[in-house]
Every structure is written in C-alpha cells, then in structure tokens.
Amino acid sequence: MVLIRVLANLLILQLSYAQKSSELVVGGLPCNINEHRFLVLVYSDGIQCGGTLINKEWMLTAAHCDGKKMKLQFGLHSKNVPNKDKQTRVPKKKYFFPCSKNFTKWDKDIMLIRLNHPVNNSTHIAPLSLPSKPPSQDTVCNIMGWGTISPTKEIYPDVPHCAYINIVDHAVCRAFYPGLLEKSKTLCAGILEGGKDTCQGDSGGPLICNGQIQGIVSVGGDPCAEPRVSVLYTKVFDHLDWIKSIIAGNTAATCPL
C-alpha cells in the first residue's frame, strides 16, 4: 500500500492515491544537535511533518502537510527539553506549485511558506542551500526527522534521527508507484536491501545531498524500509525557478492561500 508520510492515522486527505500516516526515520541514529539547524518541526491540524528553512523568511515542506492551523518550530532538537534559541512561527502565506493541492500528479507535492516574521540565525538555526544541480544516481544523501523509528509501530523519538540513503534509478519507483511518469519531477531514493527509510511523521522533511536540499519527503511504502521499495521525494531542483520567482514577488503562476 502506498503511504503518504503524515502522522495522524485518522486524518483523511483528498488525494488521488491511497495513503496512511506520515513517517519517521527508520534505521537511523539520533542526529547531532548541530547538524540540522535548517530542520523545521511542523504541526498541522494535529499531524506532524517536517520542513526546511531556505532563508530567514521562507521554508519548504510537502503540500500534503497543509492545514488550517499550522505551527512551525525552528531550532528544535529535543522536544521535551527545547533549546533556548528555539523560535516559533506561523505561515504568513502558503504557495503551492500551480494548483498542486489537486494532487493529480505525483510531482506536485511541494509547498513554499512565507513566515509571519523572519527567524534569526542562531546556534541552532540557519538555512539550507537550494540545489545548484540535481543529484546523480548513487549519490549518498541524508534524511532526518522526528518520525517513527519503527517500521511497524509508532515509536516517536524525542530528538530527530538521521540516516544515509542513496539516489536510485527512477525505474525502481516506477515499478512500485502506478502512474509515475518517467520524467516526473521526483527523486527516487532509499536502500535497495531495505532497513533505512523515512516513516510516519517525516513528511515534508528534507533529502540532503552534498549540503543542499534536493528532495522533500512525499510518498513511501507501508510498512517503511522494505527491500526494493524506495521513497518518492519531490525534486526541488525541478521547482527551482518557481521557488525563486515566488520569493522575488512573482506570484502570478501559483495558487496562494
């Protein structure tokens, strides 16, 4: 069964494909407190997602993480013992890749959020660079999030977990996800033998390759971390012109809320 990486099992979203709860990093280890300064914890209408700060006023997450009431937490490591420089924001405006909320295609699961107030760079807060070029096959990339660390049980950690996975041939994902186009604006990434994966609660979080955000956690298998079932990540590089255009003030070709 195809799994959308969202936390609440009872949440019903109007998508054109089957879904379940969002996902956490399985097979990883607790992240170092200083290696995820860009990572955002998103609470959206009772569900948990991840996100990525790309400059002091803008962040990226998955479109399916959208909600009427969203709280965005920056500079967080331990949820139980927050860092002193933790900052909380809400969206000032949300932008979806032209009408992506319809979810008629796999490659539109991206949301650009303008914060109600800029965040201040600090010990635990700093943006992640946008991609200068797309990653090649077999590139080693990092995934991270507060999602569940068990592929079959909901065991959520206090601190984000990190793991390394690889960019894999897109044919691997096309074999598992019906209707996925060969030239889809997505990346296929994982470990072919299984054991490492994003899982429930990780939706919207980053796929980081060579120090840049290359993907956004979108869709995966259920249970998580199964062999030869890689995760689909929205390909940030293919949305780069749109992202830069929105930030520059050109909102004509989008569906803002």
From Swiss-Prot:
The record places domain Peptidase S1 at: 25-248
> Which CDD domains does this UniProt record tie to the protein?
Tryp_SPc (cd00190)
Spell out the catalytic residues. Answer: H64 (charge relay system), D109 (charge relay system), S203 (charge relay system)
Q: What class of enzyme is it?
A: hydrolase
Q: Which residues form a coiled coil?
A: none
User: Where, subcellularly, is it found?
Assistant: Secreted
Tell me one GO molecular function of this protein: toxin activity
Asked if the keyword Glycoprotein belongs to this entry, the reply reads: yes
Report the record's disulfide bonds.
C31-C162, C49-C65, C141-C209, C173-C188, C199-C224
Give the glycosylated residues.
N102, N120, N121
Location, primary (coarse class): secreted
- Job description of the protein: Snake venom serine protease that may act in the hemostasis system of the prey.
Q: Record's family?
A: Belongs to the peptidase S1 family. Snake venom subfamily.
Q: What name does UniProt use for this protein?
A: Snake venom serine protease KN8
